[in-house]
From Swiss-Prot:
Entry GO MF terms: calcium ion binding
Glycosites: 73, 96
Organism, as annotated: Danio rerio (Zebrafish)
Similarity comment: family membership: Belongs to the ependymin family.
Name of the protein described by the UniProt record: Ependymin
Pfam families: Ependymin
GO cellular component: extracellular region; lysosome
Gene name of this polypeptide: epd
Main location: secreted
């Protein structure tokens, strides 16, 4: 297991160089090819919206999220597979072996920093002087004009792992947190739709249908 440690030790020299760079000219970094861990989503009002295991392939831009069935008392739980490059969203019901397939016109999300994001700041969470008691993060901001929304992302300075993200839209505000992130995915088949999804017809969705629509009260 290649568990990612929050405090950058091995790359401390590289981080120091990056720290000295002029922040306003920093270009968005790229996340590792494969990441997995736990993702939690809450509304800014404090309501838990979803919590579960995520897997992300940054090279193919594919994302899988399976909600933890023990997290909350719900009648249904989320299992989604998104192929962002192709603009396809699968809602999977493995219990009943059924599948819903939708078009996804808006293809940006918070697992990857958008190329037009602006670097806002770099700082420590916790203590910068105590061993393994702090985390250096970079904060990125930007807008999603198509959604009339804006966002903020925090990533590790070394490794470009997403730590947290905020989405502020006309209809909802969301806060994303990522825990126990590893730079591997145990089973790459999580990025392939189940066989029972084959032959399922597309359900057309509005042009502003997005990843963020999955999370609501």
């Amino acid at each position: 297991m290649h568990t990612v440690k929050l405090l950058c030790v091995v790359f401390s020299c590289l981080c120091a160089i990056g720290w000295a760079s002029h922040h306003s000219h920093r270009q968005p970094c790229h996340s590792p090819q494969l990441t997995s861990g736990t993702m939690k989503v809450v509304s800014t009002g404090g309501h838990d919206l979803a919590s579960g295991e995520f897997s992300y392939d940054s090279k193919t831009n594919k994302f899988r999220f399976v909600e933890d069935t023990t997290h909350a008392n719900k009648t249904s739980y989320m299992d989604v597979l998104i192929h962002f490059e192709e603009g396809v969203l699968y809602e999977i019901d493995s219990k009943n072996e059924s599948c819903k397939k939708e078009t996804l016109q808006f293809r940006k999300h918070l697992m990857e920093i958008p190329v037009d994001a602006t670097h806002e700041s770099e700082s420590y969470m916790g203590s910068p002087s105590l061993t393994e008691q702090g985390l250096r993060v970079r904060v990125w901001n930007g807008k999603f004009p198509e959604l009339h929304a804006h966002y903020s992302l925090s990533t590790t300075s070394c490794g470009c792992l997403t730590v947290s993200g905020s989405y502020y839209g006309e209809k909802k505000d969301l806060f994303f947190s990522f825990f126990g992130v590893e730079t591997e995915v145990d089973d790459l088949q999580v990025f392939a739709p189940p066989a029972y999804c084959e032959g399922v017809s597309f359900e057309e969705a509005p042009d502003d249908h997005s990843f963020f629509d999955l999370f609501h009260d």
